[in-house]
């Protein structure tokens, strides 16, 4: 039981770290958008890239809501497999998004980070929701 109780705060902290970096990216997305564009770009091209990045960030926040709902409701709080997956994904996302912001990576890179570090844990969280509430299985 000691390992599981150690996973709970670790998972919560990595979720919050990823969330803080995504919110920071909302504030400082201009440099990343400019990295996606050629040296001379039109306002329409800028707005298109901005809309794509904002859509990706909004999807990420929606998936955070799914994960936090499952975690805080207790559905997956003590599931060690989901906790380890979530810790690995969100820790990786925190590091990758830090590089994304500071190194001004292209916007298409965000979709890879999104798929592996936000969507995959949210899908497994949804599967746990279905198992617990639909199939009436124990969450751990």
UniProtKB/Swiss-Prot annotation:
Transmembrane segments: 7-27, 53-73, 83-103, 113-133
Subcellular location: Membrane; Cell projection, Cilium
Biological role: Plays a role in cilia formation and embryonic patterning. Requires for normal Sonic hedgehog (Shh) signaling in the neural tube and acts in combination with GLI2 and GLI3 to pattern ventral and intermediate neuronal cell types. During ciliogenesis regulates the ciliary transition zone localization of some MKS complex proteins.
Protein name: Transmembrane protein 107
Any matching Pfam family: TMEM107
Species lineage: Eukaryota, Metazoa, Chordata, Craniata, Vertebrata
Top-level taxon in the UniProt lineage: Eukaryota
InterPro entries per record: TMEM107
Keyword entries, A-Z: Cell projection, Cilium biogenesis/degradation, Glycoprotein, Membrane, Transmembrane, Transmembrane helix
Self-association and partners: Part of the tectonic-like complex (also named B9 complex). Interacts with TMEM237, TMEM231, MKS1 and TMEM216.
UniProt gene name: Tmem107
Topological category with respect to the lipid bilayer: Multi-pass membrane protein
Glycan attachment sites: 79
Coiled coil: none
């Amino acid at each position: 039981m000691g390992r599981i109780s150690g996973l709970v705060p670790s998972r919560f902290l990595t979720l919050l770290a990823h969330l803080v970096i995504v919110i920071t990216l909302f504030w400082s997305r201009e440099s990343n958008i400019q990295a996606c564009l050629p040296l001379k770009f039109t306002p329409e091209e800028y707005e298109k890239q901005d809309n794509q990045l904002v859509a990706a960030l909004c999807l990420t926040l929606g998936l955070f809501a799914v994960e936090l709902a499952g975690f805080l409701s207790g559905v997956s709080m003590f599931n060690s497999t989901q906790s380890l997956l979530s810790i690995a994904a969100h820790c990786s996302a925190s590091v990758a998004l830090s590089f994304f912001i500071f190194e001004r990576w292209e916007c298409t890179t965000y979709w890879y980070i999104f798929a592996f570090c936000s969507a995959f844990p949210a899908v497994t969280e949804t599967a746990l929701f279905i198992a617990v509430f639909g199939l009436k299985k124990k969450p751990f």
